[in-house]
Amino acid sequence: MQAMRDADTGRSSMSSPFNNRETSGDTLRVAVAGNEGGRVDKHFGAVEIFLIYDLSAVDHKLVERRAIDQLALPDEERRATIVRILADCGVLLVEKVGAAPKKLLAEAGVDALDKFKGRDIESALKELAAEYL
């Protein structure tokens, strides 16, 4: 499922971001570097598709899959594409992320966490909800 993008802002119409962004109740938008139903097992540099979840204190819902190559702009660097397509997310769960991309994501308001590496996505999201919401 791919969300529609607002022509003026480029934001997803399904957006329910967190912290300094417009919120929809107590929902946190989370990007996961892993396979659906699997584990947080993709390195930042090796991810091809991000799973996007809306997370609340009581449940989570997969709302979108974002493929980097499909969303990249012409001549856009890979890191820039990733930062842009995750800008509506408050958190990125990833197996490993280097200092430079972590800083770029933080500047865009995305907290990149590798503390859930190797964990199954379901339990990682539940633990994240307990910590953040």
Question: What do these predicted regions represent?
Answer:
Residues 80-107, 111:
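Mid-chain, well-packed structural core segment of small domains
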Residues 1-81, 87-88, 113-133:
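Non-catalytic interface/targeting segments
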